[in-house]
Amino acid sequence: MTMFNKVSRTFRFGDNDVTLTTGEVARQASGACVVQMGDTVVLATVVAKKEAKEGQDFFPLTVDYVEKAYAAGRFPGGFFKREGRPSEHETLTSRLIDRPIRPLFPKGLPEDVQVLASVISSDQENESDVLSITAASAAVMLSPLPFAEAVAGGRIGRINGQFILNPTVKEMAESDLNIVFAASADALVMVEGEATFVPEDVIIDALEWGRKEIQPLVEAQVKLRELAGKAKMAFTPQEDDAALLARIEELAAGAGLEAAMRVPEKMARKDARKLVKEKIVEALKADPTYGEDEKALSSVGDIIGHIEKKVVRKRILDEGTRIDGRDTKTVRPIEIQPGILPRAHGSALFTRGETQSLCVTTLGSSTDNQRMDSLTGDVTKTFMLHYNFPPFSVGEVKPVRVSRREIGHGALAEKALKPIIPAGDGFPFTVRVVAETLESN
């Protein structure tokens, strides 16, 4: 007799057995699933607050990926010998999990939802990041939360022209391709990767091959849901108020919204749109139908945003011009000024229309490389690209801190440049590039 209602699904996947288990641990979470491949084990949980927040204009989903040092028999670095703030790898993997699952929740879901993927065992061969995508999806599938369909994560490598699904760490060292993707039963839902000058048709073939190969992971989640899933909560998306939408469209036309959307400069257009919104709000307050309706008044911004999208789309289709007046083939004016900083090792100011980036390069010795703790041991980096997006670049006031988005965008640019940066004993240097966004439209 056991106190656990444990349900598992085990199947052969590539060169490994994969097991999905639920009902044994984290039973007070809304949903929990343990996924194991080799000796790498990931526990994913999802919890939704029972008190919903009304009136939010976004889905309050938080996704965190955590690597426990004990998973590889290691001590955390630092004085306190305890896991601290997320590493760059953990932050990037959190974003990797977030992207495929976020669109599968229904629009308008008001509950705060937290997905947590914890690496609790690592064999240092089978990568835990792609397992975490599958584990997170399975946890949500098992929970009462509405969720469109199961997705699974995978990595595609290529050695000697042959694709490999979920290659080991050793195999990845020889691969000229590193694609991380997520797929449902019938479509790709997320792709991220890097390669060493691989032709486009190879990438397309790899993705189609990977989508087919990963289906056992999707099917296993569906089966596990049938065996152990909780009853899904009832959720009816809030329907748009057709009468209010029509009234605001009428007011927007009279307030000059279309003319405001034709202002070519971003900040001037922003001011013009603000004036239009103020006119619409004042008109609604004077309207006997909506004057006392706080919900209607608070939804004006969202509805105007919806109307603006329609206006811009119609203009592109009917006139072939974009929001700033350009046609669909004209590139914004570009100006590049190299050597703009007198004491930096390398610098350039890149301006394209109302978007501007100051890029600065610093060259150091091998002692300047970045040393990082990881489950596979100490890792060093000799090339790094850091991306900063300060609030003044879009004319806003916000706290100054490094966001997940900045870390993600920096990693994306770093992947693009890494293949052309010299490495090895013939180049015993460390290179750091910083991209400072000074303007953005």
Name the predicted role of every residue range.
Residues 107-113, 148-150, 217-235, 267-268, ...:
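Flexible, glycine/charged-enriched surface loops at secondary-structure junctions
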Residues 124-130, 240-246, 438-441:
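Short glycine/threonine-rich loop-to-helix capping motif typified by GTGT followed
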